[in-house]
Amino acid sequence: MTDTSRASLKALQRGRDWIWITGNHDPEPAENIGGRFAQVLAIGPLTFRHEPSTQPCDGEIAGHLHPLARVARRGRSVSRRCFASDGLRLVMPAFGAYAGGLNVRDRAIASLFGALSFTAHMLGERRIYAFAAAQCLSD
């Protein structure tokens, strides 16, 4: 991490209780980046973890699968990072340059919600677009 990036991170952390959720990309806490580290964090009705539980888990917010959705619009296919959620659990997209994406129609994501009963919240340039999972295209 560059000195400039470290200074920016420290500025964001100032006055906050900063908690990093660790995962397979960073099994050991990084040094000198501030904050606390946890594999799982429960705050009230919410549970934050890197990898989604294979069991139903209301209030779960996870990553790991890096969902992306592909939809047909105006005669072409558009693929974008997305949040996948059924209102009870949420799988977040990857925002880093090194992480790819997994289609929301892939079994690893779709099986978390059952019967394609979730919404893909696609990230646009200026807003978020919601698509029912059934509207999303497979690879």
Positions of the model-derived regions?
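Active-site environment of divalent metal-dependent phosphoester hydrolases
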Residues: 24-31, 54-57, 66-71, 98-102
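Solvent-exposed alpha-helices and their adjacent loops that cap or buttress functional pockets
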Residues: 13, 41, 53-54, 82-84
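Acidic, His/Gly-rich catalytic cores of divalent-metal-dependent hydrolytic chemistry
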Residues: 69-139
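Generic preference for hydrophobic
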Residues: 37, 48, 120-122
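Core dinuclear metal-dependent hydrolase active-site scaffold
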Residues: 39-61
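Short, surface-exposed, charged loop/turn segments at secondary-structure junctions
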Residues: 5, 34-38, 62-66, 75-82
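Active-site neighborhood of phospho(di)ester-bond hydrolases with catalytic His/Asp-centered motifs
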Residues: 18-24, 48-49, 60-66, 92-94
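Core catalytic region of metal-dependent phosphoesterases/phosphodiesterases
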Residues: 1-41
